[in-house]
UniProtKB/Swiss-Prot annotation:
One of its GO terms (molecular function) is ATP hydrolysis activity. Domain I is involved in oligomerization and binding regulators, domain II is flexibile and of varying length in different bacteria, domain III forms the AAA+ region, while domain IV binds dsDNA. Pfam families: Bac_DnaA (PF00308), Bac_DnaA_C (PF08299), DnaA_N (PF11638). Oligomerizes as a right-handed, spiral filament on DNA at oriC. Residues 341-460 are annotated as: Domain IV, binds dsDNA. ATP binds at G168, G170, K171, T172. Belongs to the DnaA family. Residues 124-340 are annotated as: Domain III, AAA+ region. This is Chromosomal replication initiator protein DnaA.
Length: 460
C-alpha cells in the first residue's frame, strides 16, 4: 500500500508547483492502511486542517489514479496518539453524580477552547503567493529583498516592515510570501494575515458582542501579523487605537509585523502621528510600476505556471499595451488563454491583437498612417515619397508592404483609405500586401523581428 502512496506523490508532484508540493505534500508520511483507508501523518493540527481544506480532494484523485480504487484518507498528527476510547477508571467511593456532570462539562469546555485555538491559528494565506512565483526586477527589487530578509529572520532587523506602492504591483503577493515561507519552516508558527478592513469589521463585532478580550488575545499572541492596505484605517480613530496597542504588544514581545499601503506613511491622510512614527521604526520599502522587461518576465512566468505557450512577441505586445498594473497583465493573459482554449487555436500575435483590440486601444488610437510611413521610411533610409510611389524595385516594395501591413494593424483605416494614402492604390493591392507580410512573418523569424522593431519605434 505504501507504493500506492509513493506513486500518488509522484502524480501530485507533476501537477503542483515545486513550492506547494514541498510545503504541503512532501511532509505527509505514510503510516499504514486498511482495505479502504490510507493513514498519513501530518506535522501539526494546523497542517492537517490546511491540507484537508485545500488538497484532500486532489490527494484522493491522485491515489485513485494509481489503481482505480477510491480510498478514505485519515490523518494523524505527529507526536499525538490516535484517539482511543477513554480508559475507565474506578470511581472514588461516594462521588456524587452532580460532580461527575460538572467534570464532563469542564472537559467539553476544554475541547471547545482547543477547537477555538485551532481556528484562530488558520493564517488565511494564499498558497499561490510565494517568493518562487514572484518576479523581481528593478522596480521591486528592494521590497523583494526586504521581504526575504524578514521571512528568513523575523523580528530581527526590519520590524516593522512597511511596503508601499500602487494598486496591483505585488504588495499582497509579498506579504503572503513572507507568511508562507515562515509557515513552511515552522508549521506551528502563529500567523495572521488580515486586510485592515477585516481587522476593523472584526473589532466592531467584538465590541458589539462584548468580546474585546478575545479579540485582543487573538492578535497579541501571534508570531507574525500581516496587515494589508493599512490606509483604509485612516480616519477610523477607534480602529487605529486598537491597532496601536496591538502593534505595541507584538513589538515588545519581539514578534514580526508587516504592513502594506498605497502611500508612504507620511502621505496617508487621517493616519495618527503615533502610528506613523511606529511604521518608521523599521524598514520602509517601495514598489514602483514595472518596466516592459519585467512585465514580459511576469507574463512568461504566469504562462509557464499555467502550462501555456506564450510566444515572445505576444508577451511583448501585452507588456507594451498594458498599464503598469500586474493584475491587468494577468487579466489579459487569462483572456488570451481562454480564447485559445475555446477556439482550439495556438496563441499568435495576430490573435492577441484581435482579442485585445478593445483593451489595448489607448496605445493605438493615436497612431496615424502618416506616422507609420515616416517611421518605416526612416527605418529603411528611404523617402516617404518613394514609399508612396509606384516603383516596383525590391528595396521599395518590401518597405511599402510592411508599412501597409502596420497601417492595417495599428489604425482604423479601411483598405481603400490606406490605398489612398499610398498614392491611390486600389484595395486589392493593399489586401495582397497585408497577406504577403503575414505569410513572410510566419515563416521567417528574422523578418518578423524586423517588423516588430518598427512597431516598437512607433510607441517610443
Amino acid at each position: 500500500m505504501e507504493n500506492i502512496w509513493l506513486e500518488a506523490q509522484t502524480n501530485l508532484k507533476q501537477v503542483l508547483t515545486e513550492q506547494t508540493y514541498s510545503t504541503w505534500i512532501d511532509p505527509l508520511k505514510f503510516l499504514g492502511a486498511t482495505v479502504d483507508t490510507i493513514v498519513l501523518e501530518v506535522p501539526s493540527s494546523f497542517f492537517q486542517k490546511w491540507v484537508t481544506d485545500k488538497y484532500l480532494a486532489m490527494i484522493k484523485e491522485a491515489i485513485s489514479a494509481v489503481n482505480g480504487k477510491s480510498y478514505q484518507i485519515e490523518f494523524h498528527v505527529a507526536d499525538e496518539k490516535p484517539e482511543a476510547a477513554p480508559e475507565e477508571k474506578p470511581e472514588k467511593e461516594g462521588k456524587p453524580a452532580r460532580e461527575k456532570e460538572k467534570d464532563k462539562d469542564k472537559e467539553k469546555e476544554k475541547d471547545r477552547e482547543k477547537e477555538k485555538d485551532k481556528k484562530e491559528l488558520v493564517p488565511n494565506l494564499n498558497p499561490k503567493y510565494t517568493f518562487e512565483s514572484f518576479v523581481s526586477g528593478p522596480s521591486n527589487q528592494f521590497a523583494y529583498a526586504a521581504s526575504q530578509a524578514v521571512a528568513n529572520k523575523p523580528a530581527t532587523n526590519y520590524n516593522p516592515l512597511f511596503i508601499y506602492g500602487g494598486v496591483g504591483l505585488g504588495k499582497t503577493h509579498l506579504v503572503n510570501a513572507i507568511g508562507n515561507h515562515i509557515l513552511a519552516k515552522n508549521p506551528k508558527a502563529k500567523i495572521c494575515y488580515y486586510s485592515s478592513e477585516k481587522f476593523m469589521n472584526e473589532m466592531i463585532n467584538s465590541l458589539r458582542y462584548k468580546k474585546m478580550d478575545e479579540f485582543r488575545n487573538k492578535f497579541r499572541k501571534m508570531d507574525l501579523l500581516l496587515i494589508d492596505d493599512i490606509q483604509f484605517m485612516a480616519g477610523k480613530e477607534a480602529t487605529q487605537e486598537e491597532f496601536f496597542h496591538t502593534f505595541n504588544a507584538l513589538y515588545e514581545s519581539h514578534k514580526q509585523i508587516v504592513v502594506t499601503s498605497d502611500k508612504f506613511p507620511k502621505d496617508i491622510p487621517g493616519l495618527e502621528e503615533r502610528l506613523r512614527s511606529r511604521f518608521e521604526w523599521g524598514l520602509i520599502a517601495d514598489i514602483q510600476p514595472p518596466g516592459v522587461e519585467t512585465k514580459v518576465a511576469i507574463l512568461k512566468k504566469k504562462s509557464d505556471m499555467h502550462a501555456v505557450n506564450l510566444p515572445d512577441d505576444v508577451a511583448l505586445f501585452l507588456a507594451e499595451g498594458a498599464n503598469s498594473n500586474i493584475r491587468e497583465l494577468e487579466g489579459m493573459l487569462i483572456r488570451l488563454e481562454a480564447f485559445a482554449s475555446l477556439t482550439g487555436q495556438e496563441i499568435t500575435l495576430s490573435m492577441a491583437r484581435e482579442v485585445m483590440k478593445d483593451i489595448i486601444v489607448e496605445k493605438t488610437r493615436d497612431i496615424t498612417v502618416e506616422m507609420i510611413q515616416k517611421t518605416v521610411a526612416e527605418h529603411f533610409r528611404i523617402k516617404v515619397s518613394e514609399l508612396k510611389s509606384d516603383k516596383r524595385i525590391k528595396t521599395l516594395v518590401v518597405p511599402r508592404q510592411i508599412a501597409i501591413y502596420i497601417c492595417r494593424e495599428l489604425t482604423k483605416a479601411s483598405y481603400p483609405e490606406i490605398g489612398e494614402k499610398f498614392g491611390g492604390k486600389d484595395h486589392s493591392t493593399i489586401i495582397h500586401s497585408v497577406k504577403k507580410i503575414e505569410k513572410q512573418m510566419a515563416g521567417d523569424d528574422e523578418f518578423k523581428a524586423s517588423v516588430e522593431d518598427i512597431r516598437k519605434k512607433l510607441f517610443t
